[in-house]
Amino acid sequence: MKYALDTNIFIDAFRDRAAEAALLAFLERALPVTFMSAVVMQELAAGARTTQAARDVQQGVFEPFERRGRVFAPSTAAFAESGRVIATVAAREGWQLLTENPSLLNDALIAVSCREQDITLITRDGDFKRLSPLVRGFHYAAPWPPMAGPA
């Protein structure tokens, strides 16, 4: 199984030592099968408001995945499909796209691109429960999923 970490997992680790320890423990055993979404990179970079924070995110978060060639980006088809998913949610729930839930735009893109790569997203974000019925084949899990043992 392959994994990607959602933005909220990193934010929790930045803010709380116990969450950081849990993330590091997971990565210690799962780094070879863990990937970074380019969409998550964009969200984390946008949240790094100081030069030092930007450097820390680049060196401590992005570079380990980049060095291993473990960054994936949504395809053109993923952008189109995620747009259709958002339109469906907006119509069902009767909300205005950019004012009601702007983070859902990226969440839909993350869901579709994870599905494209056959990657399970680790997240605490409840929006993925709403999105998963609309993105067939997308899988997500709460932190921290059990790892398969040796065969």
PLM segments and residue spans:
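Generic structural signal for small/hydrophobic residues in well-ordered secondary structure
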Residues: 6-7, 44, 82, 114
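Cytochrome P450 catalytic domain signature, combining two hallmark sequence patches
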Residues: 51-56, 90, 138-139
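Active-site neighborhoods of divalent-metal-dependent phosphate/nucleic-acid chemistry enzymes
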Residues: 70-120
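Residues that scaffold the ATP/ADP-binding catalytic core of kinase and kinase-like folds
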Residues: 12-14, 47, 82-85, 131
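Short, well-structured N-terminal submotif of metal-dependent ribonuclease cores
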Residues: 1-37, 47-64, 147-150
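A generic structural signal for short hydrophobic patches within well-formed alpha-helices
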Residues: 10, 41-44, 128-129
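Acidic, PIN/NYN-like endoribonuclease modules and their adjacent C-terminal/linker elements
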Residues: 111-151
